[in-house]
Amino acid sequence: MKKPIGILSPGVALGTAGGAMSSKFFLMALATFFSFAQVVIEANSWWSLGMNNPVQMSEVYIIGAQPLCSQLAGLSQGQKKLCHLYQDHMQYIGEGAKTGIKECQYQFRHRRWNCSTVDNTSVFGRVMQIGSRETAFTYAVSAAGVVNAMSRACREGELSTCGCSRAARPKDLPRDWLWGGCGDNIDYGYRFAKEFVDARERERIHAKGSYESARILMNLHNNEAGRRTVYNLADVACKCHGVSGSCSLKTCWLQLADFRKVGDALKEKYDSAAAMRLNSRGKLVQVNSRFNSPTTQDLVYIDPSPDYCVRNESTGSLGTQGRLCNKTSEGMDGCELMCCGRGYDQFKTVQTERCHCKFHWCCYVKCKKCTEIVDQFVCK
């Protein structure tokens, strides 16, 4: 049973990013574009909030601590203003970023690019400077993570400006079922995530038609795709009431989907992402006009992916040397594809796992520890 759609309208077109630019700066921007063919993105990112220790995160969000927001690495000016206004929200921005990062690493664990993080506030390194489909996925899944975290924080009473969901009762809900359990506040989560995550892109000003403006449009589109995926996958959940579980009465509410389901959906969008370019009006259009235009839930990209086989400091590729591979697989995790034809080394390792588990009354499970020697394969 699907929920009613309240705040989203279908078919929002991709907008333009612009702003006036002096001729001198315009020429400099063009020179940068033709020299490097990639956008220079700020080293810091709000994603870095997801890399901090959760205990430390909760300790620094003290009401009235004005220096806090200016000290947080990775926030744009607009995001710092929102931080000052909604300091109790920032812990959940961090949790959302962390959720997105972990899901990215899960979805790409068997790919040459495995969503590795680096030890600085850019989080993913220089690879995000390229407008590739991997970058598209990363923006989408992190935006989705924020919607997820904020929506749940509202339901749990952690935020001062929101509470349980006030979504309208679905029209197809049986009349004798109650509507109004404390649901995840996805409306609020969506709105705040949009305001916060998009702030950096909306305050950047570049010449119409420049590569930088194309990246802004790409980022905004993929942010929205991530948010909509969370919104559209949320559904109605119900709990039975009645004597001996007879379920003669049900109470229902709006509930977020498991985030793995969101990650799976975005991974499918990654595989079918649309290649885009800027047209003469400064809007993103599909490179191949024979295909249907991407919807607001599809991912888009403007650059081909770099070579992830070898380490490259300029593109941020870490290469696949030293990565574990599956000798028997013919998929992306197989040694042939993962190692890019370079071959692999084999070694033996000892693995310990629980085994021979038995249930004892009452009430615990007791297991033994078993060890075995297994073969592992590592890319040369």
Curated annotation (Swiss-Prot):
<dbReference type="GO" id="GO:0030326">
    <property type="term" value="P:embryonic limb morphogenesis"/>
</dbReference>
<dbReference type="GO" id="GO:0090630">
    <property type="term" value="P:activation of GTPase activity"/>
</dbReference>
<dbReference type="GO" id="GO:0030509">
    <property type="term" value="P:BMP signaling pathway"/>
</dbReference>
<dbReference type="GO" id="GO:0045836">
    <property type="term" value="P:positive regulation of meiotic nuclear division"/>
</dbReference>
<dbReference type="GO" id="GO:2000052">
    <property type="term" value="P:positive regulation of non-canonical Wnt signaling pathway"/>
</dbReference>
<dbReference type="GO" id="GO:0097325">
    <property type="term" value="P:melanocyte proliferation"/>
</dbReference>
<comment type="subunit">
    <text>Forms a soluble 1:1 complex with AFM; this prevents oligomerization and is required for prolonged biological activity. The complex with AFM may represent the physiological form in body fluids. Homooligomer; disulfide-linked, leading to inactivation. Interacts with PORCN. Interacts with WLS. Interacts with glypican GCP3. Interacts with PKD1 (via extracellular domain). Interacts with TMEM67.</text>
</comment>
<feature type="disulfide bond">
    <location>
        <begin position="154"/>
        <end position="162"/>
    </location>
</feature>
<dbReference type="GO" id="GO:0060068">
    <property type="term" value="P:vagina development"/>
</dbReference>
<dbReference type="GO" id="GO:0071277">
    <property type="term" value="P:cellular response to calcium ion"/>
</dbReference>
<feature type="disulfide bond">
    <location>
        <begin position="238"/>
        <end position="252"/>
    </location>
</feature>
<dbReference type="GO" id="GO:0007409">
    <property type="term" value="P:axonogenesis"/>
</dbReference>
<dbReference type="GO" id="GO:0010595">
    <property type="term" value="P:positive regulation of endothelial cell migration"/>
</dbReference>
<dbReference type="GO" id="GO:0070245">
    <property type="term" value="P:positive regulation of thymocyte apoptotic process"/>
</dbReference>
<dbReference type="GO" id="GO:0021915">
    <property type="term" value="P:neural tube development"/>
</dbReference>
<dbReference type="GO" id="GO:0051216">
    <property type="term" value="P:cartilage development"/>
</dbReference>
<dbReference type="GO" id="GO:0060606">
    <property type="term" value="P:tube closure"/>
</dbReference>
<dbReference type="GO" id="GO:0140013">
    <property type="term" value="P:meiotic nuclear division"/>
</dbReference>
<dbReference type="GO" id="GO:0045599">
    <property type="term" value="P:negative regulation of fat cell differentiation"/>
</dbReference>
<dbReference type="GO" id="GO:0009986">
    <property type="term" value="C:cell surface"/>
</dbReference>
<dbReference type="GO" id="GO:0036518">
    <property type="term" value="P:chemorepulsion of dopaminergic neuron axon"/>
</dbReference>
<dbReference type="GO" id="GO:2001235">
    <property type="term" value="P:positive regulation of apoptotic signaling pathway"/>
</dbReference>
<keyword id="KW-0964">Secreted</keyword>
<keyword id="KW-0732">Signal</keyword>
<dbReference type="GO" id="GO:0008104">
    <property type="term" value="P:protein localization"/>
</dbReference>
<feature type="lipid moiety-binding region" description="O-palmitoleoyl serine; by PORCN">
    <location>
        <position position="244"/>
    </location>
</feature>
<dbReference type="GO" id="GO:0001756">
    <property type="term" value="P:somitogenesis"/>
</dbReference>
<dbReference type="GO" id="GO:0099566">
    <property type="term" value="P:regulation of postsynaptic cytosolic calcium ion concentration"/>
</dbReference>
<dbReference type="GO" id="GO:0001843">
    <property type="term" value="P:neural tube closure"/>
</dbReference>
<dbReference type="GO" id="GO:0001736">
    <property type="term" value="P:establishment of planar polarity"/>
</dbReference>
<dbReference type="GO" id="GO:0040037">
    <property type="term" value="P:negative regulation of fibroblast growth factor receptor signaling pathway"/>
</dbReference>
<dbReference type="GO" id="GO:0048706">
    <property type="term" value="P:embryonic skeletal system development"/>
</dbReference>
<dbReference type="GO" id="GO:0005576">
    <property type="term" value="C:extracellular region"/>
</dbReference>
<dbReference type="GO" id="GO:0060028">
    <property type="term" value="P:convergent extension involved in axis elongation"/>
</dbReference>
<dbReference type="GO" id="GO:0008543">
    <property type="term" value="P:fibroblast growth factor receptor signaling pathway"/>
</dbReference>
<dbReference type="GO" id="GO:0035108">
    <property type="term" value="P:limb morphogenesis"/>
</dbReference>
<dbReference type="GO" id="GO:0008595">
    <property type="term" value="P:anterior/posterior axis specification, embryo"/>
</dbReference>
<dbReference type="GO" id="GO:0072089">
    <property type="term" value="P:stem cell proliferation"/>
</dbReference>
<dbReference type="GO" id="GO:0007223">
    <property type="term" value="P:Wnt signaling pathway, calcium modulating pathway"/>
</dbReference>
<dbReference type="GO" id="GO:0045778">
    <property type="term" value="P:positive regulation of ossification"/>
</dbReference>
<dbReference type="GO" id="GO:0010820">
    <property type="term" value="P:positive regulation of T cell chemotaxis"/>
</dbReference>
<feature type="disulfide bond">
    <location>
        <begin position="362"/>
        <end position="363"/>
    </location>
</feature>
